Curated annotation (Swiss-Prot):
InterPro entries per UniProt: RNaseH-like_sf, RNaseH_sf, X-over_junc_endoDNase_Mg_BS, X-over_junc_endoDNase_RuvC
Function of the molecule: The RuvA-RuvB-RuvC complex processes Holliday junction (HJ) DNA during genetic recombination and DNA repair. Endonuclease that resolves HJ intermediates. Cleaves cruciform DNA by making single-stranded nicks across the HJ at symmetrical positions within the homologous arms, yielding a 5'-phosphate and a 3'-hydroxyl group; requires a central core of homology in the junction. The consensus cleavage sequence is 5'-(A/T)TT(C/G)-3'. Cleavage occurs on the 3'-side of the TT dinucleotide at the point of strand exchange.
PROSITE patterns: RUVC
Homology family: Belongs to the RuvC family.
EC nos: 3.1.21.10
Enzyme class: hydrolase
PANTHER family: CROSSOVER JUNCTION ENDODEOXYRIBONUCLEASE RUVC
Entry protein name: Crossover junction endodeoxyribonuclease RuvC
Catalytic activity reported: Endonucleolytic cleavage at a junction such as a reciprocal single-stranded crossover between two homologous DNA duplexes (Holliday junction)
A biological-process GO annotation: DNA recombination
Binding residues for Mg(2+) 1: 7, 139
Any one GO MF annotation of this record: crossover junction DNA endonuclease activity
Oligomeric and partner information: Homodimer which binds Holliday junction (HJ) DNA. The HJ becomes 2-fold symmetrical on binding to RuvC with unstacked arms; it has a different conformation from HJ DNA in complex with RuvA. In the full resolvosome a probable DNA-RuvA(4)-RuvB(12)-RuvC(2) complex forms which resolves the HJ.
Amino acid sequence: MRILGIDPGLARVGYGVIDTSGGHQRMLDCGIIRTDPGRSDGERMVEIASDLRQLIRAWRPELAAVEKFFFYRSSNTINVVQARGVVMMTLARFKVPVVEFPPMQIKLALAGFGHAEKDEVLEAVMRELDLTEPPRPDDAADALAVALTGWFQR
């Protein structure tokens, strides 16, 4: 199964593509969709949708796993929610099934406990995908963690 993991944001959307065929998981691609901070929010959302469409066409994921956030007092909340909406809409247009996971569930799936530190989750990602170097940037590593959670929780 090919899974696209997504860590949404307006400035950067982390993505990671894994393949789980053959009895083990392997990373096919990871990176970020970076938007231009000098552009309007609407233009940045168009950038996210356009780049995500290209990823979907290139990798043909059978499942998308998206990190789900719960913000209460963050000034960044609206931007993340808007970017997440663009991600969800684009996935729906391509009929890619979506599963969503909050950060604690991702940490639990990979590190064994929901309050794991970022470096513990990163170590688990590297181990599960048999990587010798940590995926960079951090948003891409986070997206790979989301993709792996999608596989483990299917």
